[in-house]
Amino acid sequence: MAPSRLQLGLRAAYSGISSVAGFSIFLVWTVVYRQPGTAAMGGLAGVLALWVLVTHVMYMQDYWRTWLKGLRGFFFVGVLFSAVSIAAFCTFLVLAITRHQSLTDPTSYYLSSVWSFISFKWAFLLSLYAHRYRADFADISILSDF
């Protein structure tokens, strides 16, 4: 079932705000805290949120109808970055535990693992929406063939 315009607008707004937050995390943790792990995962979360925003905007503009292979590519990119984010989450969590880092330290690997999980969330949402929109347009294209 196709989402309403309100749902699409809310999804797009949430994606846009989250992409700005991810890029802000990238800048702050690169310049101020000099913690590349958190900066990288925050930047990845921002890029993935921006990609989800592009997915929603292209769905609203009806661009996907003629380019279903693009949605398939977005799905596989989401799956790839889901795996990368889970691996980064586990790695940062193990590093934080073995180095006995504080939970409240802004330069600890615990914060990097949190942003790895947020990156996983956006990668998962990219795959989910690409799959749903592709199924939605595949049904429409089957009906339009008759």
Curated annotation (Swiss-Prot):
GO terms for molecular function: heme binding; heme transmembrane transporter activity. GO terms for cellular component: endolysosome; endosome membrane; lysosomal membrane; phagolysosome membrane; plasma membrane. Induction: Induced by iron via heme and non-iron metalloporphyrins in macrophages as well as by erythrophagocytosis (at protein level). Also induced by hemolysis. GO terms for biological process: erythrocyte differentiation; heme export; heme export from vacuole to cytoplasm; heme metabolic process; heme transport; localization of cell; lysosomal transport; phagocytosis. It is a multi-pass membrane protein. The keyword Transmembrane applies. The chain crosses the membrane at residues 12-32, 40-60, 74-94, 110-130. It catalyses: heme b(in) = heme b(out). A motif (Di-leucine motif) lies at residues 142-143. Changing residue 115 to C: Slightly decreases heme transport. Highly expressed in the brain, kidney, heart and skeletal muscle. Moderately expressed in the liver, lung, placenta and small intestine. Strongly expressed in macrophages of the reticuloendothelial system. It is found in: Endosome membrane; Lysosome membrane; Cytoplasmic vesicle, Phagosome membrane. Keywords: Cytoplasmic vesicle, Endosome, Lysosome, Membrane, Transmembrane, Transmembrane helix, Transport. Its main location: membrane. Heme transporter that regulates intracellular heme availability through the endosomal or lysosomal compartment. In macrophages of the reticuloendothelial system, is the heme transporter for heme-iron recycling. Essential for macrophage iron homeostasis, transports heme from the phagolysosome to the cytoplasm during erythrophagocytosis (EP). Belongs to the HRG family. This is Heme transporter HRG1. The gene is SLC48A1.
